[in-house]
Amino acid sequence: MQRLGIIFDTCLEVDDASRIALMQKHGFEATFFMSNDPHIRERAALLKSAGIAIDNCHAPFDSINNMWHPTTAGDEMLARLTDGVENCARYEIPVIVIHVSSGEHPPRVGDVGLARFDALVARAEELGVTVAFENQRKLGNLALLMEYYPKAGFCFDTGHEACFTPGREYMPLFGKRTVALHLHDNSAVYNADDHILPYDGKVDLERAARQLAASPYRGTIMSESFKTDFYKDLSPEEYFARAEKAIRRFADRVDFYRAQSR
């Protein structure tokens, strides 16, 4: 079985040390957090001492559309993303996950934005950090950058596929380049990006497990779920126990389909 992981901010009701203890108790060997986390130095040290790997960082995505505008705001966004790449290198985090654009009506992609992404990807390659582009709403924007940057990887987000692009499947297109996974569930209603635990919603996770098994990805089965009001009746301990059961169930299904193909 691939190792299990969960986003570090999955449960903010407990402090970092308590969260790490709960992760260890429930078999989570890896995690990730934002590349601009104000506590990145301290958290990286705590996780390292606990033997929990930091698989990747998620770059800031608020104002990501500014990357495509010929404005100083676009330059500022590039600087924030570049800082994230440099933080990954500084703390030996191999992958940074990046959104290409945001919203239903993002700006048209063009030379200004591509020049900025050129600089970002070049800096990442210089520092040995892999850029992974994540599926959001606009397949065309993602496909352009995946084609434009052949060394970039893909971050497969199961929840986004269901609630932002119903009926569309990303793994048949980019599965061979998968380097990160954001596993979470939702109601499969358009724009309902609930980020609940696997099997608590209506996402077709059986298909996701089958497609992941068919890909070369052997990295962490990483959940991007949060203890929201959906779990208000659960204690942190109960939430982590539920998370372990759900994520392990998905990992078992990946193993099942992989064994079938041998």
Walk through the language-model features, giving the residues of each.
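Hydrophobic faces of well-ordered beta-strands that scaffold small-molecule active sites
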Residues: 2-8, 31-33, 54-59, 96-98, ...
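Residue-level detector of structured alpha->beta connecting loops
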Residues: 27, 51, 92, 128, ...
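Catalytic-core regions built around general acid/base machinery
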Residues: 42-50, 116-124, 170, 207-212
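Beta-hairpin (beta-strand-turn-beta-strand) motif
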Residues: 59-62, 93, 101, 186
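Active-site acidic/histidine proton-transfer and metal-coordination neighborhood
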Residues: 68-153, 163-165, 218, 237-246, ...
